[in-house]
């Protein structure tokens, strides 16, 4: 052992993402113009009706919608447990956009699940199939969706490698917190891979102008990482056809919720259907 790492917190408040205190405060409020565009779409979107949408880097998404540029959603899940209330909020939003000619990518975070020592490969592959059935039942057109395991989509890994060149240690510490980086450093690999997921719809193999993540606000840390690393790496990303810095579109959960509600933590989660006992 050659070094002992010490750090000093210079500002108060939880970082965005997995250690957020009040998840409903993450991101920026959506503008009136976005609500007008969504109101002109076919069908109804609850967070648009009650004007509760929040965003990260929302202007490129707004401009792409106004100019009718090609758009793809990146929205998936970690297969760590049963379908829950947060999933249905997100899946209904994906279904709404699909019905209005926005296509969807659905990354399955098997890389992150594989790092979870509580889950065997057999268990998380079971939850992949179980969750996909529920997403389909919630209205997502799986036949029209690019569903993939992170570990099998080489283009995601290529993009993650490109953006990782712009990574500095202070960035994930600021986003995810020093405690997370000290106690669970391999998580950073999963975080950078998710950046590749969010950028993937713009890859030259698919040729889309803009991509955006649809999620709960607990994923804001990944969106911050995506925006910052994409900005730092845009010139290199252009070699892969990437044109814009991705956006994030957040569906608020229950107001005032403390911590991260997740299928990884059954005691904090509102399940729909069979729940964690299969």
Language-model segment annotations:
Residues 107-122, 251-254:
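Short connector loops at secondary-structure junctions
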Residues 77, 107-112, 145-157:
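Short, glycine/charge-rich beta-strand/loop segments that flank catalytic centers
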Residues 7-10, 80, 155-159, 168-278:
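Active-site cores that bind ATP or allylic diphosphates and position pyrophosphate for catalysis
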Residues 123-149:
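A glycine-rich helix N-cap at a beta->alpha junction
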Residues 1-78, 227-278:
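Non-catalytic terminal extensions that flank enzyme cores
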Residues 58-62, 91-102, 127-132, 186-202:
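Structured alpha-helical segments in the cores of large, soluble enzyme domains
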Residues 44-113, 213-215:
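N-terminal catalytic cores of NTP/NDP-binding nucleotidyl/phosphoryl-transfer enzymes
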Residues 85-89, 119-127:
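Alpha-helix N-cap and loop-to-helix initiation/capping positions
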């Amino acid at each position: 052992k050659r070094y002992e790492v010490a750090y000093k917190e210079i500002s108060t408040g939880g970082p965005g993402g997995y250690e957020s205190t009040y998840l409903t405060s993450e991101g920026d409020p959506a503008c009136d113009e976005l609500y007008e565009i969504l109101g002109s779409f076919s069908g109804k979107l609850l967070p648009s009706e009650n004007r509760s949408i929040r965003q990260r880097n929302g202007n490129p998404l707004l401009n792409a919608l106004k100019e009718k540029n090609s758009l793809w959603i990146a929205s998936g899940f970690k297969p760590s447990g049963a379908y829950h209330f947060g999933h249905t909020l997100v899946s209904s939003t994906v279904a709404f956009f699909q019905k209005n000619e926005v296509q969807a990518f659905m990354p399955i975070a098997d890389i992150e699940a594989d790092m979870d020592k509580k889950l065997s490969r057999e268990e998380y592959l079971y939850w992949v199939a179980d969750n996909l059935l529920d997403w389909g039942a919630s209205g997502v057109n799986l036949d029209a969706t690019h569903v993939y395991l992170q570990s099998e989509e080489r283009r995601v890994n290529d993009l993650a490698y490109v953006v990782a060149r712009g990574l500095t240690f202070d960035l994930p510490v600021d986003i995810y917190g020093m405690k997370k980086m000290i106690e669970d450093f391999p998580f950073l690999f999963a975080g950078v891979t998710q950046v590749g997921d969010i950028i993937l719809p713009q890859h030259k193999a698919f040729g889309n102008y803009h991509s955006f993540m649809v999620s709960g606000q607990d994923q804001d840390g990944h969106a911050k990482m995506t925006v910052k690393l994409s900005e730092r790496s845009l010139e290199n990303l252009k070699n892969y056809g990437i044109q814009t810095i991705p956006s994030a579109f957040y569906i608020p959960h229950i107001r005032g919720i403390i911590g991260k509600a997740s299928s990884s933590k059954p005691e904090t989660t509102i399940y729909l259907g069979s729940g964690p006992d299969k």
